[in-house]
Swiss-Prot record:
PSII is composed of 1 copy each of membrane proteins PsbA, PsbB, PsbC, PsbD, PsbE, PsbF, PsbH, PsbI, PsbJ, PsbK, PsbL, PsbM, PsbT, PsbX, PsbY, PsbZ, Psb30/Ycf12, at least 3 peripheral proteins of the oxygen-evolving complex and a large number of cofactors. It forms dimeric complexes. The chain crosses the membrane at residues 21-36, 101-115, 140-156, 203-218, 237-252, 457-472. Its main location: plastid. It is found in: Plastid, Chloroplast thylakoid membrane. InterPro entries: PS_antenna-like (IPR000932), PS_II_antenna-like_sf (IPR036001), PSII_PsbB (IPR017486). It comes from the Eukaryota. This is Photosystem II CP47 reaction center protein. The gene is psbB.
Length: 508
């Protein structure tokens, strides 16, 4: 036929059977990719340390999505929360992956069947004997069915009425587990961090979808609207479908990057704003302060800080620290975290407690500056030693560790103090294994960053696709070159070839 590559999809333009076939094949490819990717991730995933080597540090992409929907166990005998299990049941990680691959195979066969048997009676308009689709009716059917699925997910799966519930955690990502969620029908349901809003919104949106679907099945569109929006043209369907997809992609890019109940930090890693705002640092200091108020020693108070909370307060877990073109997981960057060394407290020879100024997100290097509780600079690591006033050596800075592996250890030699001051710029200090994966020491992004980048990019591309196909379908007669002052009225669309002698004409 000699079509250029960008026009090959026109072969299914007036062929409903094969249009259906290629969409079933597309579903087969998507489902097959999901199942295969899940099996690959399970093959390389190490579940042994859910605290310091969680899924998001290992660059897992589909495992977090399965987990947030209630899958936590593996046929390998491990659970995502740690420990071993004996009876994972059919809906394990491997079970879900297998179901997607089986479904992919069935869709593949169905696509072939519909490609071969394309000329079905159901696609034939009995009035003309030609293939046609009742697009408004199909829209109603799809709206109704998606409404049923949406309502069912919110009312049964999320609430635990018939299903496991979803992943729910505390604001600091420490106690996450899969549990049923009650719908939140008040104003709190609009808080993006309230899990109950997921249930209530799916129930409400599903109900609306069911009612709207029934409406579109029972009410025909007015003729002017039908013609004005080109409802008989399949490219209108393409344009509006692309609009729905790019809108959804923009929304989920936002909920992923800024954080929400749908993107728990235990599954996708913390957000960059939690580092920018000192979110975990404040909670750690609050807990230490509460411990001191209970007459605990500084060492005891810091030892009660969960390693998981301390690990969140480390810049290497900030998704904005990885470059867009640095491939690989976070573990391939700064290494696999082995243990928390403890919290370093710096003091000068006058006894002032000093705090290392933390590195902002978008800096690769940052001056080492130590300030006291009033924000006054007391020490630094100078760029030009000849002009230094506040160097570690001059000020006599020492460091002592509280909690972690170095609990109670102190150092006074300047080289060691400066080493830990540099590391304290990056948040809490961890021992990192860079040998196992040959990690290069350059920070990587988490799946949160990759998901956001991918969906924001494709949303932008799909936005242009919506404009393109929307314009093509609305202004098809203009683009085809029909003269608006033509004496003979051409019924454009009955035949799409201009100048075709068989095109029906009606004299005005």
């Amino acid at each position: 036929m000699g079509l250029p590559w960008y026009r090959v999809h026109t072969v299914v333009l007036n062929d409903p059977g094969r249009l259906l076939s290629v969409h079933i094949m597309h579903t087969a490819l998507v489902s097959g990719w999901a199942g295969s990717m899940a099996l690959y991730e399970l093959a390389v995933f190490d579940p042994s340390d859910p605290v310091l080597d969680p899924m998001w540090r290992q660059g897992m992409f589909v495992i977090p999505f399965m987990t947030r929907l209630g899958i936590t166990n593996s046929w390998g005998g491990w659970s995502i929360t740690g420990g071993t299990i004996t009876n994972p049941g059919i809906w394990s990680y491997e079970g879900v992956a297998g179901a997607h691959i089986v479904f992919s195979g069935l869709c593949f066969l169905a696509a072939i069947w519909h490609w071969v048997y394309w000329d079905l009676e159901i696609f034939c308009d009995e009035r003309t004997g030609k293939p046609s689709l009742d697009l408004p009716k199909i829209f109603g059917i799809h709206l109704f069915l998606s409404g049923v699925a949406c309502f069912g997910f919110g009312a049964f799966h999320v609430t635990g009425l018939y299903g496991p519930g979803i992943w729910v955690s505390d604001p600091y990502g420490l106690t996450g587990k899969v549990q049923p969620v009650n719908p939140a029908w008040g104003a709190e349901g609009f808080d993006p961090f309230v899990p109950g809003g997921i249930a209530s919104h799916h129930i409400a949106a599903g109900t609306l979808g069911i009612l709207a679907g029934l409406f579109h099945l029972s009410v025909r569109p007015p003729q002017r609207l039908y013609k004005g929006l080109r409802m008989g043209n399949i490219e209108t369907v393409l344009s509006s479908s692309i609009a729905a997809v790019f809108f959804a992609a923009f929304v989920v890019a936002g909920t992923m990057w800024y954080g929400s109940a749908t993107t728990p930090i235990e599954l996708f890693g913390p957000t960059r704003y939690q580092w920018d705002q000192g979110y975990f640092q404040q909670e750690i200091y609050r807990r230490v302060g509460a411990g001191l108020a209970e007459n605990l020693s500084l060492s005891e108070a810091w030892s009660k800080i969960p390693e998981k909370l301390a690990f969140y307060d480390y810049i290497g877990n900030n998704p904005a620290k990885g470059g867009l073109f640095r491939a690989g997981s976070m573990d391939n960057g700064d290494g696999i975290a082995v243990g928390w060394l403890g919290h370093p407290v710096f003091r000068d020879k006058e006894g002032h407690e000093l705090f290392v100024r933390r590195m902002p997100t978008f800096f690769e290097t940052f001056p080492v500056v130590l300030v006291d509780g009033d924000g006054i600079v007391r020490a630094d690591v100078p760029f030009r030693r000849a002009e230094s006033k506040y160097s570690v050596e001059q000020v006599g800075v020492t460091v002592e560790f509280y909690g972690g592996e170095l609990n109670g250890v102190s150092y006074s030699d300047p080289a060691t103090v400066k080493k830990y001051a540099r590391r304290a710029q990056l948040g809490e200090i961890f021992e990192l294994d860079r040998a196992t994966l040959k990690s290069d020491g350059v920070f990587r992004s988490s799946p949160r960053g990759w998901f956001t980048f991918g969906h924001a990019t494709f949303a932008l591309l799909f936005f242009f696709g919506h404009i393109w196909h929307g314009a093509r379908t609305l202004f098809r007669d203009v683009f085809a070159g029909i003269d608006p002052d033509l004496d003979a009225q051409v019924e454009f669309g009955a035949f799409q070839k201009l100048g075709d002698p068989t095109t029906r004409r009606q004299v005005v």
